Swiss-Prot record:
Names of required cofactors: [4Fe-4S] cluster
HAMAP family: NDH1_NuoB (MF_01356)
PROSITE patterns registered for this protein in UniProt: COMPLEX1_20K
SUPFAM superfamilies, alphabetized: HydA/Nqo6-like
Protein name, per record: NADH-quinone oxidoreductase subunit B
Single Gene Ontology BP annotation: electron transport coupled proton transport
Compositionally biased spans, kind Basic and acidic residues: 203-212
Organism: Shewanella oneidensis (strain ATCC 700550 / JCM 31522 / CIP 106686 / LMG 19005 / NCIMB 14063 / MR-1)
Length: 224
């Protein structure tokens, strides 16, 4: 599996992903396994254990911009029970959260605020873009709206819809958990940048294309 190595570069010029450099590399564990089967296997078990704890205790930052935030809050009610995914502990400060959801329209005036809040998140941190406005600007193709938060933030999961249903938010959490379970982060006490290895997850549209092409009996909207 190919991985994307992300490194922090404070001196980098302002680009699409500020303060980050990305490159495609091979699985780092495969390289470590050549040193010895025992040590390679032990490191793999340790990484899987740490990732299991991270993906099952995701604390979201309580932050909303527009109407998609209402659907996000609905996912925290008892009919949907987001606590099943360990993401019910909403934090009022980004310094105590694991990920943030950009739920709403990212106006240009809000972009510096969103970026500042993202920088206050402690590593490891993730971003979910929720709704058409956050993904691509939606119907607001105007001067005052950023055409997608990925213009100034690294996004891990995109949720389509205007607005998305709460079930879509829960699916995004499961996709994020799947991605976190395959991440490779350094297991050492060294303070400083050592890089983050993230798997290249396929788009759901591409993953389900074959299944959708093979459908012969189309269901009506009330049956979906």
């Amino acid at each position: 599996m190919k991985y994307t190595l992300t490194r922090i570069d404070p001196d980098a010029p302002v680009e699409r992903y500020p303060q980050e450099q990305r490159q495609t590399v091979d699985d780092p564990l495969a390289q470590e396994a050549t040193r010895g089967i025992m040590m390679g296997r032990l490191e793999e078990v340790l990484k899987d254990t740490v990732n299991w704890g991270r993906k099952n205790s995701l604390w979201p930052y309580n932050f909303g911009i527009s109407c998609c935030y209402v659907e996000m809050c609905t996912a925290f009610t008892s009919p949907h029970d987001v606590a099943r995914f360990g993401a019910e502990v909403i934090r009022a400060s980004p310094r105590q959260a694991d990920f943030m959801v950009i739920a709403g329209t990212p106006f240009i005036k809000m972009a510096p605020v969103i970026q500042r809040l993202y920088e206050q998140l402690l590593e490891p941190k993730w971003v979910i873009s929720m709704g058409a406005c956050a993904n691509s600007g939606g119907m607001y193709d105007i001067y005052s709206v950023v055409q997608g938060v990925d213009k100034f933030l690294p996004v891990d999961v995109y949720i389509p819809g205007c607005p998305p249903r709460p079930e879509a938010f829960l699916q995004a959490l499961m996709l994020l958990q799947d991605s976190i379970g395959k991440e490779r982060r350094p297991l050492s006490w060294v303070v400083g940048d050592q890089g983050i290895y993230r798997p290249q997850m396929p788009a759901e549209k591409e993953r389900k294309r074959g299944e959708r092409i093979n459908v012969t009996n189309l269901r009506t909207p009330d049956e979906i």
